[in-house]
Regions:
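Hydrophobic h-region of N-terminal signal peptides that target proteins for export
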Residues: 8-17
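Primary mode marks residue(s) on the alpha4-beta5-alpha5 output face of response regulator receiver
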Residues: 18-183
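Positively charged n-region of N-terminal signal peptides that target proteins for export
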Residues: 1-4
Length: 183
């Protein structure tokens, strides 16, 4: 039993180290970004790297042939959270992160098939994994009125980017516990 426990702890430690290691090289960033979306989105998607300064230029890592753009983990974040974005969501996100009010004329969609980490109240520091999800932005914030605001219950919920008020809808499509149980 002691030997089994040692093996399990070693495997768990190795998994924790590998899953929290953020991509560094361009090849790692491309691979990380492409796992954010389903294959029909990511296989032909453009891959960008995050700007080196807020509001700066995104760096092209790979030119794609469809309208989707995928980005790797955000530098400086404590977790690996790659995403794939349609042109509307990408524009909305780039404007929001640069401190500009986004102006979009239709719904935008994003995939985060690797999931994301959230704190329940936005400030407690207690984080949990949201699991794979789709996000939707709308030109009309009223579209999100009445939606759940609790990201911990597995239901669709509304959220906003740090230091911003523009809302987006997060729709988990698989519970994290279910995903771990099947691996």
């Amino acid at each position: 039993m002691k030997q089994l426990t040692t093996v399990l702890l070693t495997v768990a430690a190795a998994f924790a180290q590998s899953s929290d290691r953020l991509p560094v090289t361009d090849a790692e960033k491309i691979a990380d970004a492409l796992r954010a979306g389903p294959a029909f989105v990511s296989k032909d998607a453009t891959v960008l790297d995050w700007p080196s300064v807020p509001g700066g230029e995104y760096r092209l890592l790979r030119k794609g042939s469809n309208e989707w753009t995928c980005l790797p983990a955000i530098p400086g974040y404590s977790h690996d959270e790659p995403g794939c974005f349609d042109p509307i969501f990408l524009h909305w996100m780039q404007d929001s992160l640069a401190g500009r009010t986004p102006h979009i004329d239709r719904i935008g969609i994003s995939y985060m098939c690797f999931g994301a980490w959230q704190s329940k109240d936005g400030s407690s520091g207690h984080e949990f994994h949201v699991g794979p999800h789709v996000m939707i932005v709308s030109p009309t914030q009223d579209d999100f009125q009445g939606f759940n605001r609790d990201p911990s219950n597995g239901m669709p919920y509304v959220a906003h980017l740090p230091h911003r008020t523009e809302l987006y809808l997060v729709m988990p499509f698989r519970q994290w516990d279910e995903e771990q149980a099947h691996e």
